[in-house]
A protein has these predicted regions:
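Conserved, structured core segments of small domains
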Residues: 1-102
Protein backbone atom coordinates (compact mmCIF):
# COMPACT_ATOMS: atom_id res chain seq x y z
CA UNK A 1 0.00 0.00 0.00
CA UNK A 2 1.26 3.49 -0.77
CA UNK A 3 1.91 5.84 2.13
CA UNK A 4 1.56 9.52 2.93
CA UNK A 5 5.01 10.25 1.48
CA UNK A 6 3.74 9.12 -1.93
CA UNK A 7 0.83 11.55 -1.70
CA UNK A 8 3.11 14.39 -0.58
CA UNK A 9 5.25 13.87 -3.69
CA UNK A 10 2.32 14.56 -6.03
CA UNK A 11 2.71 17.86 -7.88
CA UNK A 12 -0.25 20.10 -8.62
CA UNK A 13 -2.45 18.49 -11.30
CA UNK A 14 -0.71 15.16 -10.84
CA UNK A 15 -2.07 11.74 -9.98
CA UNK A 16 -1.72 8.00 -10.07
CA UNK A 17 -3.80 4.87 -10.42
CA UNK A 18 -3.62 2.16 -7.77
CA UNK A 19 -4.42 -1.53 -7.88
CA UNK A 20 -4.22 -3.30 -4.55
CA UNK A 21 -2.60 -0.18 -3.11
CA UNK A 22 0.31 -0.13 -5.57
CA UNK A 23 0.80 2.26 -8.50
CA UNK A 24 -0.01 0.67 -11.84
CA UNK A 25 -0.12 1.61 -15.51
CA UNK A 26 -1.58 -0.26 -18.46
CA UNK A 27 -0.74 -0.22 -22.16
CA UNK A 28 -4.35 -0.53 -23.30
CA UNK A 29 -7.92 -0.35 -22.13
CA UNK A 30 -9.86 2.32 -20.29
CA UNK A 31 -10.00 3.43 -16.67
CA UNK A 32 -13.40 4.41 -15.34
CA UNK A 33 -14.52 5.59 -11.91
CA UNK A 34 -17.74 4.46 -10.30
CA UNK A 35 -17.69 6.83 -7.32
CA UNK A 36 -15.40 9.35 -5.73
CA UNK A 37 -14.68 11.61 -2.81
CA UNK A 38 -12.50 14.63 -2.23
CA UNK A 39 -10.60 16.03 0.71
CA UNK A 40 -7.97 18.62 1.59
CA UNK A 41 -6.67 16.42 4.44
CA UNK A 42 -3.85 14.07 3.45
CA UNK A 43 -4.71 11.66 6.30
CA UNK A 44 -8.32 11.52 5.10
CA UNK A 45 -7.02 10.82 1.58
CA UNK A 46 -5.10 7.81 2.92
CA UNK A 47 -8.21 6.62 4.79
CA UNK A 48 -10.24 6.82 1.57
CA UNK A 49 -7.58 4.88 -0.34
CA UNK A 50 -7.74 2.14 2.30
CA UNK A 51 -11.57 2.26 2.22
CA UNK A 52 -11.40 1.51 -1.52
CA UNK A 53 -8.88 -1.29 -0.75
CA UNK A 54 -6.26 0.51 -2.81
CA UNK A 55 -8.23 0.14 -6.04
CA UNK A 56 -8.62 3.77 -6.99
CA UNK A 57 -7.34 6.78 -8.82
CA UNK A 58 -5.75 9.66 -6.93
CA UNK A 59 -5.60 13.17 -8.34
CA UNK A 60 -4.15 16.23 -6.59
CA UNK A 61 -5.13 19.73 -7.68
CA UNK A 62 -4.95 23.05 -5.84
CA UNK A 63 -4.72 21.47 -2.40
CA UNK A 64 -7.53 18.96 -2.97
CA UNK A 65 -7.09 15.18 -3.19
CA UNK A 66 -9.66 13.50 -5.44
CA UNK A 67 -9.98 9.79 -4.66
CA UNK A 68 -12.06 7.79 -7.16
CA UNK A 69 -12.92 4.11 -6.90
CA UNK A 70 -12.02 2.93 -10.38
CA UNK A 71 -11.22 -0.07 -12.50
CA UNK A 72 -9.97 -0.94 -15.97
CA UNK A 73 -12.22 -2.15 -18.77
CA UNK A 74 -11.26 -3.27 -22.27
CA UNK A 75 -13.43 -1.08 -24.49
CA UNK A 76 -14.29 2.57 -24.78
CA UNK A 77 -17.93 1.61 -25.22
CA UNK A 78 -18.00 -0.17 -21.84
CA UNK A 79 -16.09 2.66 -20.16
CA UNK A 80 -18.49 5.28 -21.52
CA UNK A 81 -21.53 3.26 -20.45
CA UNK A 82 -20.23 2.89 -16.89
CA UNK A 83 -19.06 6.50 -16.83
CA UNK A 84 -22.47 7.83 -17.84
CA UNK A 85 -24.29 5.55 -15.39
CA UNK A 86 -22.02 6.78 -12.58
CA UNK A 87 -22.23 10.44 -13.66
CA UNK A 88 -18.53 10.74 -14.41
CA UNK A 89 -17.12 13.63 -16.43
CA UNK A 90 -14.63 11.53 -18.37
CA UNK A 91 -12.82 8.20 -18.74
CA UNK A 92 -9.10 7.63 -19.36
CA UNK A 93 -7.63 5.88 -22.40
CA UNK A 94 -4.49 4.09 -21.24
CA UNK A 95 -2.93 3.88 -24.71
CA UNK A 96 -2.94 7.66 -25.29
CA UNK A 97 -3.39 8.86 -21.69
CA UNK A 98 -6.16 11.05 -23.11
CA UNK A 99 -9.66 11.61 -21.80
CA UNK A 100 -12.96 10.82 -23.48
CA UNK A 101 -15.79 12.94 -22.14
CA UNK A 102 -18.95 11.15 -21.12
Amino acid sequence: MINIRTLRKLNNNDGLTLKGGKPITYKSGWQVATEGKETRDINEAMRLIREYKGNCGVWYSDGVYYIDKSHRVNTKREAMLIGRQCQQISVLCWRTMGLAYC
